[in-house]
């Protein structure tokens, strides 16, 4: 059956305490009123509380897009990965510093030109992303499924329960109910085994 390798990259999250944060700090997002926008709803260390050190980054700003693109390029070249996963790819904020949508489009386009056989996958989506990201996790638009699935495919979210105890691994949701009858699958979604 085989397997494919797809590392995850934080599309719009950066640790303000990281040693090289200053290289791309200008890409930290502010709300339209100027207040700092933190990506503080994610729990990375499984303590059931947000972290407090994540800046919400803007891919429209060259410094962040180039830094993230370099990290993805390094993983592709060093490990020969089959795909790369852009966590929270559908995140968008009306940030006057730069156009977030244009930034993600440029990142994906640059990587596709350099590595045409490496698949881009995103989490979350909005209609304009369907033009250049063909695969997503976390499908939730059931009323318009037939329309959306003409342009992209979807697989189960990272929080999809693993067989047995229903663990979601390191994801902040902890455990979910595993249904042995249906394998916790939904119609139209690529079957996904999370371990």
Tell where the protein language model's regions lie, with residue ranges.
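Short, solvent-exposed turn/loop segments enriched in Gly/Ser/Thr/Pro and often Arg
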Residues: 9-15, 86-92, 124-127
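Acidic (Asp/Glu)-rich catalytic clusters
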Residues: 2, 76-77, 184
